[in-house]
UniProtKB/Swiss-Prot annotation:
Keyword line: Cell cycle, Cell division, GTP-binding, Magnesium, Metal-binding, Nucleotide-binding, Septation
Organism: Aliarcobacter butzleri (strain RM4018) (Arcobacter butzleri)
Protein name: Probable GTP-binding protein EngB
Function: Necessary for normal cell division and for the maintenance of normal septation.
Gene name tied to this protein: engB
Gene Ontology molecular function, alphabetical: GTP binding; metal ion binding
Residues the entry annotates as binding GTP: 30-37, 57-61, 85-88, 155-158, 177-180
Length: 200
């Protein structure tokens, strides 16, 4: 199964002004500068689809993208889902500050969106043990429903040497390992998403 089309749908400030929850959604979240926009663009083969903005306020919006998948089934040749680009979170060091870092609306989206199926937590492979990422992982595990999964995807692996990458893979055997620069792991992430959403 491959992505054949991707387009920006809308931005929203909260779950209340989000699109109708009638299509499965995949949420991408991670620290600021983790490479989230680049990964989204590589996944969809659409340069500039997701844009990292330096404009204050822009980064606080939830951005929705409609994704069209081509199947191998003649009866159902296309399937649809949404990728959701969430605001990057900052560098808070205390667990209690997590919900303050993310505004109330973002937390509401993560907890209340009924069609949200996959959390893709993007983590900088050079700093896999940061407290903020551990806090996010714990938070997601707390709110995760039985029909949802968390995917830990490690970005910028081209910055690691071979022994560092081997250790990372040992430490996180279920992780996805990505290099946007060298386009490594992109298909692995796509397969993980489509396998869970559509069973293939």
């Amino acid at each position: 199964m491959t992505i054949v089309d991707a387009k920006f749908l809308q931005s929203a400030q909260s779950v209340n002004d989000s699109p109708a929850p009638n299509v499965a959604e995949v949420a991408f979240l991670g620290r600021s500068n983790v490479g989230k926009s680049s990964i989204l663009n590589s996944l969809t083969s659409r340069n500039g689809l997701a844009k990292s903005s330096s404009t204050p306020g822009k980064t606080q919006l939830i951005n929705y993208f409609e994704i069209k998948f081509k199947t191998k089934n003649e009866e159902t040749p296309y399937l649809f889902a949404r990728f959701v680009d969430l605001p990057g979170f900052g560098y808070a060091k205390v667990a209690k500050s997590l919900k303050a870092e993310w505004n109330k609306n973002l937390t509401g989206y993560l907890q209340l969106r009924p069609n949200l199926q996959i959390f893709v937590h993007l983590i900088d492979s050079r700093h896999p043990e940061l407290e903020i990422d551990k806090n996010v992982d714990e938070f997601l595990k707390e709110i995760k429903r039985g029909d949802q999964i968390i995917v830990n995807a490690f970005t910028k692996i081209d910055k690691l040497n071979s022994s560092e990458l081997s250790k990372l893979k040992r430490d996180y055997p279920d992780g996805i390992f990505l290099s946007n620069l060298k386009k490594r792991g992109i298909i692995d992430l796509q397969d993980k998403i489509t396998g869970y959403l559509f069973g293939n």
